[in-house]
């Protein structure tokens, strides 16, 4: 079975390995890195069935990328950035080919409840911007959807992978909610080797603060 992961940041890569090591260690996993500065150099996994490839950091949601993905005949596609028209274009068309589309938590985006003024107007403006971006790339979705601030609401998303399923303010209809596997020693060793840091952290008499880079 083949799986595709679309990643942009170190956090995405870390979470991808959490999913792979727990659920898909015996499958063929293709990690596509769309990052200009965040993830540099060669990314090579210790698992022989994990393959990394590069994409442009923007404007990769085009027909040629879609065809490349189709050749892989994936069972699942995982992506993190819900506000990316590139990801939405690719996910929509792969879902039409019966590929399972999984949106994976990126930060705390799944959990807020939005009470913005003129919420509908903002949704319409962002929907227009989405379609404008796609048309500029000659990338077409032959249906109209209205962008929503409700996380993962788009109907062609099949699964939501989140750290805290019980904290979701709502569950979109017909979505399967899956907890992201916990970080384990195998994943720590894997990412420490990839990013070249020591897997152990001194904890005596220090305060460890971890924030988003």
Briefly describe each language-model feature range:
Residues 5-150, 163:
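Active-site and donor-binding regions of nucleotide-sugar-utilizing enzymes
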């Amino acid at each position: 079975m083949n799986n595709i992961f679309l990643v942009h940041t170190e956090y995405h890569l870390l979470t991808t390995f959490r999913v792979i090591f727990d659920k898909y260690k015996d499958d063929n996993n293709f990690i596509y890195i769309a990052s200009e500065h965040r993830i540099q150099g060669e990314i090579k996994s210790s698992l022989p069935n994990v393959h990394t490839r590069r994409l442009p950091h923007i404007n990769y949601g085009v027909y040629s990328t879609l065809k490349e993905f189709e050749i892989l005949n994936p069972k699942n596609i995982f992506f993190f950035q819900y506000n990316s028209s590139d990801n939405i274009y690719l996910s929509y068309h792969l879902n039409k080919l019966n590929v399972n589309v999984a949106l994976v938590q990126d930060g705390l985006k799944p959990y807020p409840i939005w009470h913005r003024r003129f919420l509908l107007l903002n949704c319409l403006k962002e929907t227009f911007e989405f379609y404008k971006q796609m048309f500029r790339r000659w990338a077409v979705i032959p249906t109209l959807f209205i962008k929503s601030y409700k996380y993962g609401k788009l109907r062609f998303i099949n699964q939501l992978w989140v750290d805290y399923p019980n904290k979701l303010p709502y569950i979109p209809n017909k979505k399967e909610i899956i907890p992201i596997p916990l970080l384990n020693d195998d994943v720590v060793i894997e990412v420490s080797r990839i990013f070249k840091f020591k897997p152990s952290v001194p904890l005596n008499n220090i305060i460890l603060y971890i924030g988003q880079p």
